[in-house]
């Protein structure tokens, strides 16, 4: 959430910043409400001053034994008007909050300006895509030929955009998650968490999924109780650990890693990636979350992104880092790097991790604060990124490590998790 004081003091700068996202926002409603608020605030303060003055007169009159009924009637009338003014101010606050809740974050000054993914800027590449001496198959064909990837049975059980992994492939999927967790905890200093897969609306509001993106979520109704939602990412439960908390400055940074399934309706996918495991309703992710001092968030963003890259390098998967342009960033992000892994069957790079710095945007929605060196509370900065998406990493291994005989070579770093197995072959 943006700071309402920023809108009040420099609305033009806010509008200019948000316009970089490619969708100019009409602030006429905000301006009209703000004008009414100022008038009402001034009138309320005048009425309060009048009431206080008249109340003193009443005391003086009564002290002299004189009639105070006329002045008391004036106080009563002022009280009625005050009550109406205060009620309207409360309504305006609700309207302001609704406007603020719908506004995305302002892109950082370092973010390239562009309207869509064509404006994204490549920062680096790592690894050289393999040259095959046989016809490359996509991950769906590779997995099905192994007899270990079954979309038909998954569709029977649940419908489209689900998969069923079997045998060695299921074990490889588990090995990937374990390897990622071990790396981030042992080498990168993260604390592992096991978090709820169902969260309340307040948690989704805090990280920015609600109210704008409810159609992307799976909602669980519970009779007359408040609904819960299946998490779209571990970012939601993990970041909300600091909701409504005041931390000590010494406690920062907080660095958490969490492996969860993620659930998304893919309402806005427009029929993309229907085949295979690229875009599913249920998929696993190992998520990195940091809560940091505001002065450290830019540095933390580079660190977190690099930690996700290290996983790809250990797996020997070619990738590139992209700086997302202003029009392609997520709602809550101030700056985002995407890591894209090479998929030979598609002959292109595809997103496997998105690493974002949210600045104070989420913290303001969550009221996640720390006490600074002047003993005053200040908003934290939050960051997160996939370290990595497990299913898409599995896809990349199936495609990049496939062999002419249909087998798949297991990356060396995963073999200890696979009982020393070097190759996945058809049963």
UniProtKB/Swiss-Prot annotation:
Q: What is this protein called?
A: Serine--tRNA ligase
InterPro entries reported in the protein's UniProt record: aa-tRNA-synt_IIb, aa-tRNA-synth_II, aa-tRNA-synth_II/BPL/LPL, Ser-tRNA-ligase_type_1, Ser-tRNA-synth_1_N, SerRS_1_N_sf, SerRS_core, tRNA-bd_arm
For this UniProt record, give its keywords in alphabetical order, as a comma-separated list: Aminoacyl-tRNA synthetase, ATP-binding, Cytoplasm, Ligase, Nucleotide-binding, Protein biosynthesis
Record bears the keyword DNA repair: no
User: Which NCBIfam families does the record match to this protein?
Assistant: serS (TIGR00414)
Question: Can you tell me which residues bind ATP?
Answer: 264-266, 351-354
- Cellular component per GO? cytoplasm
Q: Which family does it belong to?
A: Belongs to the class-II aminoacyl-tRNA synthetase family. Type-1 seryl-tRNA synthetase subfamily.
Record's subcellular location = Cytoplasm
Q: Name one Pfam family in it.
A: Seryl_tRNA_N
Its UniProt domain note says: Consists of two distinct domains, a catalytic core and a N-terminal extension that is involved in tRNA binding.
């Amino acid at each position: 959430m943006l700071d309402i004081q920023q809108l009040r003091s420099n609305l033009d700068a806010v509008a200019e910043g948000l316009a970089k996202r490619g969708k100019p926002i009409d602030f006429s409603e905000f301006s009209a409400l703000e004008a009414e608020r100022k008038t009402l605030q001034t009138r309320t303060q005048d009425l309060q001053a009048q009431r206080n003055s008249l109340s003193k007169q009443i005391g003086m009159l009564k002290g002299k034994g004189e009639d105070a009924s006329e002045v008391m009637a004036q106080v009563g009338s002022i009280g009625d008007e005050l009550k109406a003014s205060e009620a309207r101010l409360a309504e305006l606050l609700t309207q302001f909050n609704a406007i603020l809740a719908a506004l995305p974050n302002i892109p950082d000054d370092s973010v390239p300006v562009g309207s869509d993914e064509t404006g994204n800027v490549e920062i680096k590449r790592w690894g050289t895509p393999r040259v095959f001496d046989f016809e490359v198959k996509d991950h769906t064909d590779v997995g099905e030929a192994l007899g270990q990837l079954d979309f038909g049975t998954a569709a029977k059980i649940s419908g489209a955009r689900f998969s069923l992994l079997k045998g060695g492939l299921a074990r490889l999927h588990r090995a990937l998650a374990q390897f990622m967790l071990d790396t981030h905890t042992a080498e990168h200093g993260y604390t592992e968490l096991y978090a709820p897969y169902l969260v309340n609306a307040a948690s989704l509001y805090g990280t920015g999924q609600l109210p704008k993106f409810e159609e992307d979520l799976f909602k669980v109704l519970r009779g007359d109780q408040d609904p819960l939602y299946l998490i779209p990412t571990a970012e939601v439960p993990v970041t909300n650990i600091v909701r409504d908390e005041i931390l000590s400055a010494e406690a920062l940074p907080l660095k958490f890693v969490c492996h969860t399934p993620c659930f998304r309706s893919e309402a806005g996918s427009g029929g993309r990636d229907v085949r295979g495991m690229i875009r599913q309703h249920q998929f696993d992710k190992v998520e990195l979350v940091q809560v940091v001092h505001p002065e450290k968030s830019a540095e933390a963003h580079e660190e977190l992104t690099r930690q996700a890259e290290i996983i790809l390098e250990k797996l020997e998967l070619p990738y590139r880092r992209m700086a997302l342009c202003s029009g392609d960033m997520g709602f809550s992000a101030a700056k985002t790097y995407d890591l894209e892994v090479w998929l030979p069957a598609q002959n292109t790079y595809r997103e496997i991790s998105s690493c974002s710095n949210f600045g104070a945007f989420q913290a303001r929605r969550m009221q996640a604060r720390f006490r600074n060196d002047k003993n005053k509370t200040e908003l934290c900065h939050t960051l997160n990124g996939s370290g990595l998406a497990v299913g898409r990493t599995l896809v990349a291994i199936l495609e990049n490590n496939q062999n002419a005989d249909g087998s798949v070579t297991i990356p060396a770093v995963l073999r200890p998790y696979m009982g020393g197995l070097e190759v996945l072959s058809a049963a």
